[in-house]
Amino acid sequence: MLAKSKTIRVAINGFGRIGRLVFRALLSQKNIEIVAVNDLTHPDTLAHLLKYDSAHGEFKKKVVAKDNTLMIDKKKVLVFSEKDPANLPWAEHNIDIVVESTGRFVSEEGASLHLQAGAKRVIISAPAKQKTIKTVVYNVNHKIINAEDKIISAASCTTNCLAPMVHVLEKNFGILHGTMVTVHAYTADQRLQDAPHSDLRRARAAACNIVPTTTGAAKAIGLVVPEATGKLNGMALRVPVLTGSIVELCVALEKDATVEQINQAMKKAASASFRYCEDEIVSSDIVGSEHGSIFDSKLTNIIEVDGNKLYKVYAWYDNESSYVNQLVRVVNYCAKL
């Protein structure tokens, strides 16, 4: 159990898009101390990419790399370059929580390497490989975490957007079955220009194509909203925007509902994680959002044919900052256990 009154010591493994934004977000948390980052890239490069961000702008703090550390204003953060997490000095530095954001150590075996190194808990910034690892979306099912849980998955950015809508519809109307599509900003797991990739669609130039591909969000939703297990499938359309995405969810419901009833149920569920929006927005309007999911009430619609109804709802998310803020909420929750 982590002491409730003490400052929580955090390390970040993997200083890519998510790792750097987690760093920015955690730095402003009064009860969190970022002790170290681990990445195989040279500290000078890490410092530059932390300071300058094409999607989220310049970091308004002084950032300097010096002697295997990052100096953020006057705060020193250690920088390690270790391939094997088991060899990291987490015990020596009394690390309470590791944010595992490499995308590589997402299995129980891989994440446990941080525990072997002396960390008290690991939060994976991706879907976990095993269902034995609890998958949580803050303000949907995060209260399933208990003090004994050593490895936790904060799910994916898309699952964090989808889950609140599924939770509300399942709770209020019951979902029979459905499908979802995320229109998703391109990511580093695509090719900038046409080049080999195991997914032949992701092999095509990301910045000039609409790229149909897979998403695990529809299948993973059952880990967060158990009542929806097996009821959804889905796919992704990767599009040429830097960040900012939207989920379309199309379902058949057990109970009849109107647009107004659906919107009212979503509005009632609004929270710091789930924003209810009545404005006619576009993707650039939600870049930098701290909400994990932004419900677009103007897009709710119903189609009825021969008494059979299909319901469509939509939610926006910044696939970077929306997710990072949800992950930080999970970190803070774990810090209080």
Swiss-Prot record:
Recorded catalytic activity of this chain's protein: D-glyceraldehyde 3-phosphate + phosphate + NAD(+) = (2R)-3-phospho-glyceroyl phosphate + NADH + H(+)
Major place of residence: cytoplasm
GO biological process, one term: plasminogen activation
SMART domains: Gp_dh_N (SM00846)
Disulphide-bonded residues: none
Binding site for D-glyceraldehyde 3-phosphate: 156-158, 187, 202, 215-216, 238
Active site: 157
Pathway(s) it belongs to: Carbohydrate degradation; glycolysis; pyruvate from D-glyceraldehyde 3-phosphate: step 1/5
Superkingdom field: Bacteria
Enzyme Commission number: 1.2.1.12
Binding residues annotated for NAD(+), in chain numbering: 17-18, 39, 83, 125, 319
Top-level enzyme category: oxidoreductase
GO MF annotation, one: glyceraldehyde-3-phosphate dehydrogenase (NAD+) (phosphorylating) activity
Keywords, comma-separated and alphabetical: Cytoplasm, Glycolysis, NAD, Nucleotide-binding, Oxidoreductase
Protein localization: Cytoplasm
Site (Activates thiol group during catalysis): 184
Transmembrane portions of the chain: none
This protein's GO CC annotations: cytoplasm; membrane
Keyword Cytoplasm annotated: yes
InterPro entries on file: GlycerAld/Erythrose_P_DH, GlycerAld_3-P_DH_AS, GlycerAld_3-P_DH_cat, GlycerAld_3-P_DH_NAD(P)-bd, Glyceraldehyde-3-P_DH_1, NAD(P)-bd_dom_sf
Function: Catalyzes the oxidative phosphorylation of glyceraldehyde 3-phosphate (G3P) to 1,3-bisphosphoglycerate (BPG) using the cofactor NAD. The first reaction step involves the formation of a hemiacetal intermediate between G3P and a cysteine residue, and this hemiacetal intermediate is then oxidized to a thioester, with concomitant reduction of NAD to NADH. The reduced NADH is then exchanged with the second NAD, and the thioester is attacked by a nucleophilic inorganic phosphate to produce BPG.
Sequence similarity: Belongs to the glyceraldehyde-3-phosphate dehydrogenase family.
UniProt name for this protein: Glyceraldehyde-3-phosphate dehydrogenase
Source organism of this protein record: Mycoplasma pneumoniae (strain ATCC 29342 / M129 / Subtype 1)
Organism placement in taxonomy: Bacteria, Bacillati, Mycoplasmatota, Mycoplasmoidales, Mycoplasmoidaceae
Gene (UniProt): gapA
